[in-house]
């Protein structure tokens, strides 16, 4: 009964928040303290296990499409990595997923410029949705020596969950995210039955520990849930002017 009541409260809260979001400013959902402690990660990359679905092996983008029109993904493939093409926008997987384990590696270029949110910004949307903020975003950003609001730094679930620590490596080094994603569940009528949850290891260090989400991850306003099923995984081409980042060695295991 307590769980049902909690979910009902969240549903009502999501509705009321959605009505108020248009009047909010981005700064109203930015948190600047406490700042997560920096830790130094170990060095290790993980090969895909035998039951993994390979989403990117460094050769082509066959498993990806452009988000805006579902055409063939047009990011740049070179040296076993894909680099964001900011001119063509986000890309997402052809395949849809519900619950899964994800491994992905990314690199902020060594010549990165900019500051705050305009420095190596990208994002991994653990379920890409065609409305609102576009889903549930795990932030990608250079925060090795770059301050920003802490619920928007690398390792955060954007504007919703601050990372436990700052495990960022220097620009120019390959970094890893290992994610366990459990999608939200909805009734046939669209009522929320269970919240989304996520566990994230950043460069082998725990930064999100079975974190439950109150909804999607908007830039402006409060999170909200809306009924959806299985969804693609999306990589963001952020509109900031800093040099584009790269990804490699992406695989997923369905759970």
What are these regions (language model features)?
Residues 1-21:
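Bacterial Sec-dependent N-terminal signal peptides
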């Amino acid at each position: 009964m307590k769980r049902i009541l909690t979910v009902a409260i969240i549903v009502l809260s999501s509705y009321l928040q959605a009505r108020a979001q248009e009047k909010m400013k981005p700064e109203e959902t930015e948190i600047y303290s406490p700042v997560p402690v920096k830790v130094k990660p170990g060095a290790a990359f993980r090969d895909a296990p035998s039951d993994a679905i390979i989403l990117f092996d460094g050769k082509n983008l066959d498993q990806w499409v452009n988000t805006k029109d579902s055409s063939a993904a047009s990011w740049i493939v070179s040296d076993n990595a894909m680099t964001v093409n900011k001119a063509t926008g986000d890309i997402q997987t052809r395949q849809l997923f519900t619950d899964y384990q994800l491994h992905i590696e990314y690199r902020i270029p060594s010549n990165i410029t900019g500051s705050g949110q305009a420095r190596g910004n990208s994002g991994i949307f653990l379920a890409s949705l065609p409305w609102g903020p576009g889903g549930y975003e795990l932030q990608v950003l250079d925060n090795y020596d770059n301050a920003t609001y802490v619920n928007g730094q690398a390792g955060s679930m954007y504007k919703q969950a601050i990372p436990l620590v700052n495990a960022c490596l220097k620009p120019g080094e390959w970094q890893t995210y290992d994610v366990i994603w459990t999608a939200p569940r909805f009734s046939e009528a669209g009522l929320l039955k269970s919240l989304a949850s996520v566990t994230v290891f950043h460069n082998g260090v725990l930064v999100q520990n079975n974190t439950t989400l109150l909804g999607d991850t908007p830039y402006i306003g409060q999170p909200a849930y809306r009924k959806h099923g299985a969804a693609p995984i999306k990589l963001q081409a952020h509109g900031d002017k800093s040099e584009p980042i790269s990804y490699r060695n992406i695989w997923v295991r369905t759970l």
